[in-house]
Design a protein with these regions (language model features):
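Phosphodiester-processing cores and adjacent nucleic acid-binding clamps
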Residues: 1-190
């Protein structure tokens, strides 16, 4: 698997979702001949220090990230009918500026934006976008949800908005194939 890198990975720190433990994640990347691996736990960065140390100790490039929850309106809006469902977005750090911005976003999500989950909004993403790369995420991302709803143009507009927020070359559409029917449906559209 030379040249392939897992960029959307949930560890044991993604409660009720991730199962891989950090030492095993790093060891598996080595076994597969990968030179880097990311950690992108849901809404939290609890495991990044252990991950960074484990990867560095084994000669693997650690890519620090987080799968954030994006509020449908603003992170301060908390009306059940409109704000109870958030959208996923994967953020990866390109450099130390990105790391500091990701810490800021995740901290704001927990201290200001929490409503069912720690949430950020598009304005915060715009403000703290330097040094970050964004991926469109899983079926719970805004773009896949729009595609599933038959809203191709709205999905396209959201992709263009993310490209504008993060800058040219810093936003990517994510393809996943876990054998899920919905993924097979939207992947050709992505």
């Amino acid at each position: 698997m030379s040249g392939f890198v897992h960029l959307h990975v949930h560890s044991e720190y993604s409660l009720l979702d991730g199962a891989c433990r950090i030492p095993g994640l790093v060891d598996t990347a080595i076994e597969l001949g990968q030179t880097a691996v990311a950690i992108t736990d849901h809404g939290a960065m609890y495991g990044v220090i252990d991950f960074y140390k484990a990867a560095k100790a084994k000669g693997i490039k650690p890519i620090i990230g987080c799968e954030v929850y994006v509020a449908p309106r603003t992170h301060l809006d908390k009306v059940h009918e409109y704000d109870s469902e958030s959208r996923h977005l994967v953020l990866l750090c390109k450099n130390n500026v990105g790391y500091q911005n990701l810490i800021q976003l995740v901290s704001l999500a927990w201290t200001e934006g929490f409503y069912n989950k720690p949430r950020v909004d598009d304005e915060q993403l715009r403000r703290y976008s330097d040094g970050l790369i964004a991926l469109s995420a899983c079926l719970a991302g805004e773009i896949p949800r729009r595609l599933l709803a038959g809203e191709y143009e709205a999905a396209k507009q959201k992709a263009l908005q993310y490209q504008e927020i993060f800058g040219e070359g810093n936003f990517y559409l994510e393809l996943q194939d876990h054998g899920i029917r919905e993924q097979k449906y939207i992947n050709p559209m992505i």
